[in-house]
Amino acid sequence: MQIIWDETKNHKLMTDRGISFEIFADIIINKKYIDILENPSRPNQMIFVCTYNNYTYSVPFILDKDQNIVLKTVYPSRKYHKLYGGKSYESKT
């Protein structure tokens, strides 16, 4: 299993939001995410909830046919920031 993403989208994230998939891939690989949720608006998609720079981010993803995690986008989430209060991860092991 690998974590993959679209490089064009990654460049756009770096330009527009000052973040990158690499940052969140590292958080995910090290199991430092807060939660994994079903995406209520997309039936085959899940969301990693992560903290970065003291703010809560949503990282929607899918699993491809080879069980790779395909990151779709990253965005700051007021909804999850209110819900989780900006807390950092708890060990997932």
PLM-predicted stretches and their roles:
Residues 1-93:
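Ribonuclease/tRNase effector modules and their secretory precursors
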